[in-house]
Each structure stands twice: as C-alpha cells, then as structure tokens.
Amino acid sequence: MIFFYCPNCWSRIEEDEKVCPKCKAEIKAFDHLSYFEKLVRALNHSERTTRIRAAYILGELKDKRAVKPLAKALNKAHGIRDMFFEEAVVIALGKIDGEEALPVLIDLLDHPSFLIRGAALNSLSRFKNKKATQAIKKALDDPSLSIQELARKILQA
C-alpha cells in the first residue's frame, strides 16, 4: 500500500488531495522545489525511515548546503531520542567534505550516547586537519572504553 503525505506538515493525505486537510497547504505549491530542497524537508518527515533515507542521500550528495539543515535536524532529534536517525545524520555530516561540518561533529563527541560519539569519531577521521586530530585525541579520555579504543585506532592509522 502506498501512502501520501503533505509536504508541509507531513500528515497523511489522499493521493488526489489538492489542499492538505490539516495545515491547508496547497500540495502543488511544493512541486517547484529542487531535489535537494525536498530532501531537506524530508528530514522532518513523520516516518522515521524517510528521515533516515533523506539524511543518507544528503550525505551521498556531499553538498555543503546540507550541513545546517542536518545539524538542525540533529538538534530536533536529540529531544526524541531516535538514535538511528541521529547516527544517519552524523554519518552524512562526515561525508560532506568541508569545514562547515567540523564544529558540529566535534560537539557530538559530548553526546550522551556512545553510539553517536563513535559515529562522530569515525566521521572526524575523514578530516585531515589539526582541529579534527585534537578532537579525536580528546576522545582518548571518553568514559566509554570502546570510544577510547576507536580514538586510538584512528590516531594510529
């Protein structure tokens, strides 16, 4: 079965809806958006697999414009504790080559979940600069032994 969603509020709608019954947005008005813009909007989709897929594709595109929307989505996700989505966002940020993602990834080394800290470390390992190396060294003092070990492996590589 195929489900259709309003591209504004992500409420489920009927296939032939012209206006969203919930938010009153005109559905056709979103047709002009670029693929990139639609992916960014999908980071807020009500269905978690769509959010994860959007983060993954944004990472694969390696478009630096995605850093801010990904970071914003990560901040929103932190409140609902969707570790799989958060991890997908961290991995996507690591695939985007550019200094824009670096501060976000460094901040994630203080995330409460060792899974997210590990994903941030792996993403930071792609950056070959002083800031990233200093952040990875800081992870040697992480409370999680697995994070400490990962940091050692990255620094030895």
What are these regions (language model features)?
Residues 46-47, 77-82, 112-113, 143-144:
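Short inter-helical turns and helix N-cap capping residues of alpha-solenoid HEAT/ARM repeat scaffolds
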Residues 54, 86-89, 120, 151:
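Conserved hydrophobic register position within alpha-solenoid helical repeats
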Residues 43-44, 59, 75, 94, ...:
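Ankyrin-repeat helical core positions
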Residues 6-9, 20-23:
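Short cysteine-rich clusters marking metal-coordination/redox-active sites
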Residues 23-26, 57, 92, 123-126, ...:
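Core register positions within helices of long alpha-helical scaffolds
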Residues 13, 27:
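Cys/His-rich microdomains that often coordinate metals
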Residues 2-3, 31-42, 63-77, 98-110, ...:
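Amphipathic alpha-helical scaffolding segments comprising HEAT/armadillo-like alpha-solenoid repeats
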